[in-house]
Amino acid sequence: MVRHHLAATAIAACAAPSLLAYNVSPSATFLNQALAFVLWGWFVIACAGLSTPRVAWRQRAEWPVLVALALLCAAALAPWWFGVLPSSLALSVLGTLVATVVLLVAGAQAARGEWGTVLFALFCLGWLCAGVLNAGISIVQVFAPEWPDGDWIAHSGIPGRAVGNLRQPNHLSSLLLWYCVAVAGLLELKRLRRVAAWVLMALMVFAVVLSASRTGLVSVLLLALWGLIDKRLSRATRLLLLASPLMYLLAWLGMSAWAELGAHRFGGAARLAETDVSGSRFGIWANTLALIRQQPLMGVGFGEFNYAWSLTPFPGRPIAFFDHAHNLPLQLAAEIGLPLATLVMALFLYALWRPAKAALHLAGDSGLALRCSLLMVVMIGLHSLLEYPLWYAYFLLPTAWAWGYALGACASSGVLSSSASTASSETTTSATAPRLMAAGAALVMGGALAVVDYTRVSVIFSSAEGAAPLVQRIAAGQRSVLFSHHADYAAATLDEGDAEPAVGASLPTPPPTPPPPLAPFKGAAHYLLDTRLMMAWAKALAANGREDQASHLAARLKEFRNEQSDALFAACAKAPSPAAYPCHAPQRVYNWREFMP
């Protein structure tokens, strides 16, 4: 009965967040992430009552990651303390980092107990179910694109490519590669038949091809490398892993032939035709290195990458509005400075090296579980060199659990032979379970309360019948604990025509229009600067007598070459050129810190 409950919670935690297609503006992934908090918290609660040996904190193998996370918490606290980072953004970051600590400790605790291998097998079962269902969604998105309704199955915004219900092909491929590791692990643990493993592996590789993700291709090659070098795997498992690149090639050729013969769309062909193989990453990496050179010691501040990058002159910048460097080490170096980023990355690398070293010696099912969990972390780490999957709770939390498991497993033999393991299961359970249960319950409650708080801003972006006037909805949203920056965005970009006048009200001669307030930009600009917000901010700066700063902002906006900003520069085409702020260069180049409201 206990095992069935654990299996149900593992499947729900792994699969449900990636299957939820329904979303509510302004965030397309918030509900998925909130669901991840709730379900992974429930998984922690379910595992907390299992007997595990008591381990002193100084003996815990997960300490390098805990120290790194503590440093990141301090880095997030500092700009909030000094009034730079809005409280809603700081609290969101801190809550996520604390949740990461909970899953890390829970994973390590699971690996130390007698249920360790069983729990990892159930973890793999969860990703197996998630992968099969997401593969089915991928097939529908490519072969029957008219079927998705947006609520149960998401529409693919990229013709001929699968994006899953997470709506991102790279996220889909990362999830599917975890599913592949789970298939190999379950086969090796003799919990999956060979024929079933081959069918499931072929399905996974086919779905990765449908996503046309380059990250997915690299990960498939990594699977083959695992099969090549890990000689402790059975012959059947090694053949399965070594065959994955061949499966990929055959699936790609088959899809290409299908597209040519039937005049269908295969997104992989478009990917091959792209001239910029980096997808603008080389450009954003070059800009990030420039930011690092400008602020090498302290960085631009935690969470301030988009703010600093958008306001710094980069004439050849990528035209997309990047809120991340698409490379974890570069992101950390740019935001928290080279010294602290180097320390954090060194701790992370040490926390990878330690289980990797132990994997060379630990045999049996425990050794296999260690290698599989470590490979899952390595795969998402490689993805983090090209994207930012760990900024999403549905990847971050299971990564923390798997990493904790790998660290706990690498030290389990030493722990179990120590005097600490002589404590009885009953004593150990009573000492450990309440704290983990409380932490898991906090995640469940936190995820649920976050949804309630989110409704305070989601109503701003809906037009339900009987809703309060827009200005009132914005004011209510600005009182949100975690999402007030979304309400600030609405307030900052609110056009005069968006206000809803009272029916039948008299219309006296209006007084002179006051300049737009700058306060809403303090929250909105630190979340994401886009075309609409930059235009509104430039207009507000000019109206408040800061025309030269408005010219600087307009010059930065022009670098993005976005059609939505053409209206701002339309008057500049007239002869002679007007003296308005969008039409002339600023008298000097401003540092991005000078725009702090």
Go through each PLM region and give its residues.
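TM-adjacent membrane-interface loops and short helices in multi-pass inner/ER membrane proteins
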Residues: Q168, F282-F322, P329, I336-T342
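Alpha-helical transmembrane segments of multi-pass inner-membrane proteins
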Residues: A8-L20, A36-A48, C73-W80, V93-A106, ...
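Transmembrane alpha-helices of multi-pass inner-membrane enzymes
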Residues: F37-V44, V181, A224, L362-A423, ...
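Membrane-interface catalytic loops of GT-C/OST-like multi-pass glycosylation enzymes that act
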Residues: A28-L31, S87-L91, L166-N170, A212-T215, ...
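Transmembrane signal-anchor hairpin modules in multi-pass inner-membrane enzymes, especially those
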Residues: M1-A78, V84-S92, V98-A121, L125, ...
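Flexible juxtamembrane loops connecting transmembrane helices in multi-pass membrane enzymes
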Residues: R161-A162, L223, A251-N287, A369, ...
